[in-house]
Structure formats: structure tokens, C-alpha cells
């Protein structure tokens, strides 16, 4: 009784007053303040170090150990964001960010994210958000048309598509669908016979998703690639591996082909691989997370040759089509296989439209039940910019990558290690330019570059060769930025070789 009285007293003496978590005019005022902050951040992002200079654990020293009991004014919070959060950011928005693959952004996508957040709908079934469901179906068909995918991947045909969070989720869903199709024929005890194929260049999430789908770790085949195939999968090697597995009593289940590997943007020959997959009844998925976006340009569309024989395809507009994270598009040729594997139908979600099988319920196309109104930002991007400007954006990045490649080739101290397919350039200092071991001297150069704060690049090792990666693609990058990073590379190389 005493504790209840104390609470009542505390509440009656509270200075907070009536609590309204959302009040239109106050939101308008605060949102204007936040938009100004964001616009200023984008405007000035080049003045910040690209790679954060803080030490691990820095933030715990600056943030109180407990949450505030009483509310704090937005002005104080904004000051702390500038003082404590921004210094700890590796600035992916910087025009001098060339690491990994840049996460692209745009005004249209930001507005779409704002609207999606504001509406806050949860579109797990059609009835829970009809507009969210139907716009996603339309946008997925739009993008499929732009990519010149066959009708078998569209809702207007016999297939369909869904916007997932990431490529990992897309591949997990398709492996599960392939697994269920196989086990319906073979029986559940045969799961130990199922084999999945990728390459040693396939994204690291592939073995993880296979394991999550119940594939035995020893049954995950990562096909070795070589410089002779530009680190793409050799159809001959794949065929031999599949034939050996069949002879040993295994069941080939799933093949993940990649358009634009993370290390070097290597491309697997979809046309040839799909023929082998179809011959052996293997579900073939094309992971085009990065390079698939380039296929909206006619000059790159040939990378999708053979797509009519593929079972599923995914690409991530957040990598190159100006959409904020997260946004991955997954198309499947036979949606019923996905639905058979992933459908749930609890009593509390049942409704007349779903029961009559008249609508799409996207909860049955993904792992989770809940989902955002993800299609809004893609809809705004496509309408605000049109295909022509998206193609121009892709071509501009590729042109800057080609320009950087030419500068590298013109300097006799450097070499291009693997062919440039898109806007990523993989290069290194040659073995004979320094008394240091070739890997050591290239590591030193990368460390020197990143320590300046003026650029952020990463490395990879392919075929036993350590190389530097420069990935053009930030939404803010222009030709003069690429020119400046090359000037910086040359200057630091001069300094490094003098020391060596």
C-alpha cells in the first residue's frame, strides 16, 4: 500500500505534465530542425574524416550509464548528436568513401522513407495495408520490366516479387523453398543428402544461409575459381562436381550464381550455369545485389542472358539505385513454391480476402511477419528520376571507375589485378617497386591512405593476391573527388617508396 501511495505522490509532483508522444505542430517544428541538421550534414560531410577516428568504447565514456527519468529538450539532444555521435560515424555518405560497396541515397528515397515511417503501416496481409501490398506488386513489376525480365518473374505474368531487407534473407527464403520442394519428393530423412553450390567468391552469407536452412555444413560446395575465368564459376568445374555428387548418392539442390562479387565484381556465366542447373533439377538463384542494377542499362543487360532458365533473382537498390538501406528485391518464377515453404495462417490474421485466395499476403513471402511500407521509396525514385536518370547515374559511376583504371595503368608502379567490369577497380603496387614484400608494401599504402581521413578504401585477397579496392558509387562522388584520391595515392606512394 505504501509503495502505491509513493508512486501517486511522485506522479502528482511530476513536472512533466500531460504526455503526448505525437502532437502535429510540435512534430512539424522538430522535424524542420532535424531536416536542417541532415541537410547540413550532407552539405558538410566532406569536412569530416571519412573513417571514424574514435577508439573502441569511446561512447560509453560520454553517455550516462542510465536513461533519463525526466525528458530532455531536443536542443540538448541535437548538441550531443553533433558532439558525441557524429565523431563516431564512419561517413558512408562521404564522396570520398570508396570502401566495400557504397550505400546510395537520394532525396526521393529519403522522402519515401519519411512517408513510410509516418504511415507506420505493417503490411503482413493485404487487408492490413492494401496500398502497401499493391504498390509493392506494381513497383516490382516496373523494375522487372526495366531489367527486361521475362513475364515469368512478374505478377502480370506467372511469377512475382517481394522487397526483402537484405540479400541474405532473399537467399535463405529461396533455399528453404528449394529444400521443401526436394523433401516433398524424397522424404524428410533425406535432408542429409541435399547439396548447395556457390563459389569461393560467393558472398560470405551463402554458407550461413545454407546452415540456417538445415543444409549440412559438409554439403556446402564452394567451387574454386581461377584467374583464367576472371574468378567466375567455371561451368565445366560445376558439371564435374555435380556429377560426382550424384554418383556418390547426393542430391544437388541449389546453386547461387553471382553478378558482381563483393571482392572484385566477378560475374558468373548465368547462361551456361542455368543450363546445367536445369539439366540436374537444381534451383538456381542469381545474386545480383550489386551489379544487377547496372543491367537497367542496355550495355550491361547481357550479364542476365539465360535469366529465363533461372528460378529466382535478387538485387539490392540500396547499393546502386539510390535507395536507402534496406531494400533488396527478390523475384521468383514459381511463387507457389515460396508460399508452400513459408506460409503461416494463425487465427488472429485470418480474413475473408486471404481465405478466398484473392490477394497477396507478403508475410508468406519472407521469414518475418511484420514489414514496412518498403515500396514507397522505390516508387518515388522511379517516378522522380525516371529510368533515364538512373541509367545516367550508373554510367557516370562506371565512367569514373574507368577513368581511375586508366590512371592506374598509366603509372608503371601499379597494376590492375583483375578486370574492371563496373565501377570497382582492384589494383596494387607491383612486386618489384619496393624491397618490402609486395603484400606488406600494399598494406602500408592502404593504412597510410585511410589514416589521412581524406579517403576510406578496403582490400581483398583473391587468388592469393592482396589488392586494394576502390569502389566508385557514393551518391555525392564527382570526377574531381576521384581525381583527388588518385593524386593522394600517388603522393603517398612517393613517400612510401622513399622510406622503403
Curated annotation (Swiss-Prot):
Keywords, ordered alphabetically: Decarboxylase, Lyase, Pyridoxal phosphate
Gene Ontology CC: one annotated term: cytoplasm
CC cofactor: pyridoxal 5'-phosphate
Catalytic activity: L-tryptophan + H(+) = tryptamine + CO2; 5-hydroxy-L-tryptophan + H(+) = serotonin + CO2
Family: Belongs to the group II decarboxylase family.
Protein's UniProt name: Aromatic-L-amino-acid decarboxylase
Gene3D superfamilies attached to this UniProt entry: Aspartate Aminotransferase, domain 1 (3.90.1150.10), dopa decarboxylase, N-terminal domain (1.20.1340.10), Type I PLP-dependent aspartate aminotransferase-like (Major domain) (3.40.640.10)
Key word Lyase present: yes
Any single GO BP term: amino acid metabolic process
Enzyme nomenclature, EC number: 4.1.1.28
Modification sites for N6-(pyridoxal phosphate)lysine: 319
Lineage of producing organism: Eukaryota, Viridiplantae, Streptophyta, Embryophyta, Tracheophyta
Positions annotated to bind pyridoxal 5'-phosphate: 168, 262
Cysteine pairings via disulfide bonds: none
UniProt cross-references to InterPro entries, sorted A to Z: Aromatic_deC, PyrdxlP-dep_de-COase, PyrdxlP-dep_Trfase, PyrdxlP-dep_Trfase_major, PyrdxlP-dep_Trfase_small, Pyridoxal-P_BS
Top EC class of this enzyme: lyase
Residues where L-tryptophan binds: 102, 203, 318, 348
Variant or mutagenesis effect after changing residue 370 to S: Acquires the capacity to produce dopamine from L-dopa and increased accumulation of phenylethylamine by gating indolic versus phenolic substrates
Outcome of mutating residue 348 to F: Acquires the capacity to produce indole-3-acetaldehyde from tryptophan
Pfam families: Pyridoxal_deC
